[in-house]
């Protein structure tokens, strides 16, 4: 049975990847269908009730700069906002928000329901329709076929998902939701490498049974940060505190005593878990010398008594979970509302994807999110936006686009995955980006919004606000460069008391701002130097561009050198056995990874500069030396 309409793009799954994919394709004018097993769970925060953080916040800002929904929903749902690494340089500062689950889900659903060109339909997908190496549609659980030339698959943890609590396990996509078994079996027939990964979640605690007086209160920042570039503090709901407590030796003894019934340590779980978000069992085992571990007590919302104890993700049996929770200071009488669990699921080797996130083996089929081996809402949302955008571009007959590593954390994410692959759940850190001074949270819009507008992702309202901000920054920078103060100027009397070294020769306002003891608000407060910019985000941008101009230019010079052969394309059907001079080891690595560009090839572990030179010579001799479209 065929549905009565055809679509341009079909998105399977309504999590963070799926919602951003569907919204991106629809914003670009493609007739888009979002299929989900349950419309009520669209935008669900399945694990921790938070958005952002180190590296992750950068991705949220980039999603926002390209017109995505995650940051907007966070501003409407955030019940505590903090800037992490605020005492460090701007490259590693990151915004993190504690979110009310219900408010976040409601805002995402509101955005989806009001998006032109987007249709929602509640049905699980069991099969893909593939004809002559190209996807042409999908078939749902009830046998209904939907047709489209592009399909974006964002299955999350649902593919052959198996939930573990102690030695008990059962099939599930997450607690309370069925897994996707038929679709997982169908995908296993495709010529794409497959593996198993694992993630977990902590038990949820009843706030009424916690003694918060025995814990350390953690308040949000003042002034309140805002997540979206078009957001405003007035959108934030009521702000509340989180709390901090710690495990202790008694906790650790309880956990050690239960390891014989742990599915992780008894060999029941095959999948590899996230290195940077380990279970409490893993922490006790790997860091045996530590006498305590920090736990963040995070409210799940304004109108719920559920608490998320960030730091004790576990799949231990329920009785062990209850005992370990009650051994922690402030939770001696705690009651568990939902037990913690681990979940195993299928993922596919992202080296079998192009950097557009289209599979190399099936034309028109795109993967995004945890199916590619990543972990985290932010990583999923970023991939979803890219996959939905490129699916739409392909359908419209336009060139696909993926930012380079020097243009966005999204570019770093996709390049890492498609070039190196991953054997464990991948999460983003600022340390993964070699050009992180240029890839700051604060300039994500300046880096990406113009490109987003060109592609069709950015609407008129966002574009107008961005253009106004960009123009005000440029005009203010011009003013600071063009206005000067002399040693005999009347302005000296108000200026010198604020400087470590008095002015001895003429200096521009820009020179003054570059001094370590001076910042933009202080300079603008001095008589004769202001009034400056009213928009604090534009003012921050002016200060950063001035103070870090030397470092920024140096990094840009490095990029210009590195980019010379970065985008030189490598034909996917290139027979590396025919390239004279390559070692058998290098040939094996190239055949295994199938890089799309010289840049990707150069980042494969064990690839030598000599091998890259040999490849370039071969391409030149064969007349294949050309840049890959970006």
From Swiss-Prot:
Cofactors that this protein relies on: FAD
Gene3D superfamilies documented for this protein: FAD/NAD(P)-binding domain, GidA associated domain, C-terminal subdomain, tRNA uridine 5-carboxymethylaminomethyl modification enzyme MnmG/GidA
Any Gene Ontology CC annotation: cytosol
Main location: cytoplasm
Keyword check for Amino-acid biosynthesis: no
Annotated residues for binding of NAD(+): 273-287
Keywords: Cytoplasm, FAD, Flavoprotein, NAD, tRNA processing
Binding annotation for FAD: 13-18, 125, 180, 370
Membrane-spanning parts: none
Keyword Ion transport assigned: no
Subcellular location: Cytoplasm
Any one GO molecular-function label of the UniProt entry: flavin adenine dinucleotide binding
GO biological process, one term: tRNA wobble uridine modification
Subunit structure as annotated in this protein's UniProt entry: Homodimer. Heterotetramer of two MnmE and two MnmG subunits.
Family to which the UniProt record says this protein belongs: Belongs to the MnmG family.
Database matches in HAMAP family: MnmG_GidA (MF_00129)
Function in brief: NAD-binding protein involved in the addition of a carboxymethylaminomethyl (cmnm) group at the wobble position (U34) of certain tRNAs, forming tRNA-cmnm(5)s(2)U34.
Name the UniProt record assigns to this protein: tRNA uridine 5-carboxymethylaminomethyl modification enzyme MnmG
Taxonomic lineage of the native organism: Bacteria, Pseudomonadati, Pseudomonadota, Gammaproteobacteria, Alteromonadales
Gene: mnmG
């Amino acid at each position: 049975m065929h549905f009565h309409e055809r679509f341009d793009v079909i998105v399977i799954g309504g999590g963070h990847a799926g919602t951003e994919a569907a919204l991106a394709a629809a914003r670009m004018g493609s007739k888009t269908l979002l299929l989900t097993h349950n419309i009520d769970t669209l935008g669900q925060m399945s694990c921790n009730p938070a958005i952002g953080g180190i590296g992750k916040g950068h991705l949220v800002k980039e999603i926002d700069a390209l017109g995505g929904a995650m940051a907007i929903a966070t501003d409407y749902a955030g019940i505590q906002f903090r800037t992490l690494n605020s005492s460090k340089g701007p490259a590693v500062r990151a915004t993190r928000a504690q979110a009310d689950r219900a408010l976040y889900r409601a805002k995402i659903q509101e955005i989806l329901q009001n998006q032109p060109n987007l249709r929602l339909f509640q049905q699980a997908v069991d099969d893909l329709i593939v004809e002559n190496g190209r996807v042409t549609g999908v078939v749902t659980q009830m046998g209904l076929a939907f047709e489209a030339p592009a399909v974006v698959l964002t299955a999350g943890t649902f593919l052959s998902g198996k939930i573990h609590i102690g030695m008990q396990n059962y099939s599930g996509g997450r607690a309370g939701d069925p897994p996707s078994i038929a679709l997982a079996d169908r995908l296993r027939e495709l010529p794409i490498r497959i593996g198993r990964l694992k993630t977990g979640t902590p038990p949820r605690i009843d706030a009424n049974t916690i003694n918060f007086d025995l814990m350390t209160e953690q308040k949000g920042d003042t002034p309140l940060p805002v997540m979206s570039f078009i957001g405003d503090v007035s959108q934030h709901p009521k702000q509340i505190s989180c709390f901090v407590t710690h495990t202790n030796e008694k906790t650790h003894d309880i956990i050690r005593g239960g390891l014989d019934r742990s599915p992780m340590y008894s060999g029941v779980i095959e999948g590899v878990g996230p290195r940077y978000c380990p279970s409490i069992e893993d922490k006790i085992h790997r860091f045996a010398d530590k006498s305590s571990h920090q736990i963040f007590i995070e409210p799940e919302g304004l109108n719920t008594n559920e608490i998320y104890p960030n730091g004790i993700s576990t799949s231990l049996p329920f009785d062990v979970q209850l005992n370990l929770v009650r051994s922690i200071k402030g939770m001696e009488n705690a009651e568990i509302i939902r037990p913690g669990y681990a979940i195993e699921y299928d993922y596919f080797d992202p080296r079998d994807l192009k950097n557009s996130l289209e599979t190399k083996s099936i034309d028109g089929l795109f993967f995004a999110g945890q199916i590619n081996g990543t972990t985290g809402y932010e990583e999923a949302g970023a991939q979803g936006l890219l996959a939905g955008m490129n699916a739409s571009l392909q359908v419209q007959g336009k060139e696909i686009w993926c930012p380079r590593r020097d243009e966005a954390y999204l570019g770093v994410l996709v390049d890492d995955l498609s070039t190196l692959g991953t054997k464990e759940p991948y999460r983003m850190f600022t340390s993964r980006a070699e050009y992180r001074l240029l890839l700051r949270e604060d300039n994500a819009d300046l880096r990406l919004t113009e490109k987003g507008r060109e592609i069709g992702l950015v609407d008129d309202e966002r574009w107008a606000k961005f253009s106004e901000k960009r123009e005000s920054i440029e005009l203010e920078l011009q003013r600071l460069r063009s206005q000067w103060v002399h040693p005999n100027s009347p302005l000296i009397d108000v200026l010198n008391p604020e400087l470590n070294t008095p002015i001895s020769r003429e200096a521009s306002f820009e020179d003054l701002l570059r001094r370590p003891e001076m910042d933009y608000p202080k300079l603008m407060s001095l008589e004769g130097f202001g009034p400056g910019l009213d928009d604090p985000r534009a003012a921050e941008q002016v200060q950063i561009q001035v103070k870090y101009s030397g470092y920024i230019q140096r990094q840009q010079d490095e990029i210009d050198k590195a980019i010379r052969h970065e985008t030189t394309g490598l034909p996917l059907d290139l027979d590396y056995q025919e390239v004279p001079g390559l070692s058998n080891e290098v040939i094996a690595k190239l055949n295994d990874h199938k890089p799309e560009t010289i840049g990707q090839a150069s980042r494969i572990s064990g690839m030598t500069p000599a091998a890259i030179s040999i490849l370039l010579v071969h391409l030149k001799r064969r007349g294949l030396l050309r840049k890959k479209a970006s």
